[in-house]
Amino acid sequence: MEIFDYDNVLLLPRKCRVESRSECDASVTLGQRSFRLPVVPANMKTVVDEKICRWLASNGYFYVMHRFDLDNVQFVRDMHAAGCFASISLGVKQPDYDTVDRLVAEGLCPEYITIDIAHGHADTVKAMIAYLKQHLPQAFVIAGNVATPEAIIDLENWGADATKVGVGPGKVCITKLKTGFGTGGWQLSALKWCARVATKPIIADGGIRSHGDIAKSIRFGATMVMIGSLFAGHEESPGKTVEVDGEQFKEYYGSASDFNKGEYKHVEGKRILEPIKGRLADTLVEMEQDVQSSISYSGGRRLMDIRKVNYVILGGDNAGEHLLM
């Protein structure tokens, strides 16, 4: 198997068929809905909150709300009252089953439910998927996180409508250092490996450091790309604002960090400071334009045309072996 990551792969251009990148369609469909971009902010406390989720949903973007210190039932109720779709995260513990029971009792069904645990190839995830399919069959179920084709096959067979690929490649994730496991350093290879067996959408989660990495993720099989650090540190971001030597920063920390947990127990995340980047809306516009440019370089007009291009692995012997794959 080839081992590569975002920083040592480049996509090869094909003849351009548009006069302007604005002719390129960067939208993507996930479940019953289409979204302006194939990106979703990470479901982390320092990246999204209720206000940001409502804004994203109202403006044609996908979102997944985090599952920490939150009343999911009230969140679904509020989003539906605002005329927005609801997209929540669940774990696999008893309180998560209680949440499902409360949703059913109140006649509420979120459009999207993400089963979100660090090691998603697990019997506990199988049980939660089955419970969701039995009690909230209309919900689109995303399950993860995983790193192998075996995991993709199992999750799809268990009933997941989409899978989330990536174990520890994120900027504030230290899973590989703490455990010796993960996709840090080869996330893009892991995505390609998993996509070969997938029959349902994959969300590539983690390791994105630039907008060009979005196109690379699409090329190697992702339908959607989950991004943390690039979305953290905006004016609207929920992270605490910190001033260092006169410069403004926002806190950004991993979901399994002691900052998120409030205790130093089984820590697989760390805290960093992100320089404040300005407004989230401006970043999303820039992202959309960059993805449109990627589509134009691919010789296409639609997002999935990026999947047709060849690529080179930098530092390898030659480009030839990667042509027409």
Swiss-Prot record:
Extract the Pfam families matched here.
IMPDH (PF00478)
**Which InterPro entries did the record assign?**
Aldolase_TIM, GMP_reductase, GuaC_type_2, IMP_DH/GMP_Rdtase_CS, IMP_DH_GMPRt
Q: Per UniProt, where does NADP(+) bind?
A: 202-225
Q: Which GO terms describe its molecular function?
A: GMP reductase activity
Q: Any one cellular component term from GO for this entry?
A: cytosol
The chemistry this enzyme catalyses reads: IMP + NH4(+) + NADP(+) = GMP + NADPH + 2 H(+)
**Its GO biological process terms?**
purine nucleotide metabolic process
UniProt key word NADP: yes
- What keywords tag this UniProt record? NADP, Oxidoreductase
Where in the sequence is the signal peptide annotated? none
**Gene3D superfamilies listed in its UniProt record:** Aldolase class I
Entry function: Catalyzes the irreversible NADPH-dependent deamination of GMP to IMP. It functions in the conversion of nucleobase, nucleoside and nucleotide derivatives of G to A nucleotides, and in maintaining the intracellular balance of A and G nucleotides.
Identify its protein family.
Answer: Belongs to the IMPDH/GMPR family. GuaC type 2 subfamily.
Q: What is this protein called?
A: GMP reductase
Organism, scientific name: Paracidovorax citrulli (strain AAC00-1)
Q: Which gene encodes it?
A: guaC
